[in-house]
Amino acid sequence: MAFLSDTLARVKPSPTVAVTQLAAELKAQGKDVIGLGAGEPDFDTPDNIKQAAIAAIEAGKTKYTAPDGIAELKQAICAKFKRENGLDYAPAQISVSTGGKQVLYNAFMATLNPGDEVIIPAPYWVSYPDMVLLGQGTPVIIEGKPELGYKITPDLLEAAITPKTKWFLFNSPSNPTGAGYSRDELKALTEVLMRHPHVWVMTDDMYEHLAYDGFEFCTPAQIEPGLYERTLTCLGV
């Protein structure tokens, strides 16, 4: 009898961790390498953040919090959505986690049933398919077109949708390519999604503020109000 569950046996070890560990080992050997694994910045935590954390500890803010985040933080996130994205959310619609990966994983575990499909544009963050598999879902990969900067088209999205599709997982700007969808490109994708009301939208907006050369970030619910009620937005603040 196997010790590991069949579900866990379906996933592979994290490539991100493997690459990060290899880079650390090579650096320890004195070799000059650039690590392209974990997204660790090359600067220290800013002093104002350090001091705020220290002040919170000294003020006794060391107890259990509400499982979905403290009220002040949820209110700040609501204000962020309104200020930067033109979206109105109430604190009850906000859930704070220990990281974006936990948000996506929890969502898949809470919503997927065996046979449910999740559409994932490629190239993609390496954890996406494994999280779907852990939720007993089926990853459906759409290959982005190199001539379009590894982005997908409305026709590719349309062709991937089936009656079993539960989620469309959308990441812009993209990890790993950095590709970002323009307002017009995103509008074209939302028009496809509006024709399929059984498909929910999960947006990984973690790189919202890593935008350069005049790129205007947009998120699906911002482009198409009709998607507001069936969109889960994951971001970092």
Language-model segments: what does each one mean?
Residues 199-200, 216-237:
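Conserved active-site segment immediately N-terminal to the catalytic lysine
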Residues 116, 137, 193-200, 228-229:
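A short helix->loop->beta-strand "cap" motif at the edges of active sites that frequently abuts
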Residues 88-94, 114-117, 164, 228-231:
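Short acidic capping loops at alpha-helix termini that bridge into adjacent secondary structure
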Residues 133-140:
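A short helix-loop-beta submotif of the ANL/AMP-binding
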Residues 110-132:
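Conserved PLP-anchoring active-site segment centered on the Schiff-base-forming lysine
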Residues 5-99, 106:
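N-terminal small-domain helix-loop-helix segment of the aminotransferase-like
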Residues 144-215:
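Active-site phosphate-binding strand-loop segment of PLP-dependent enzymes
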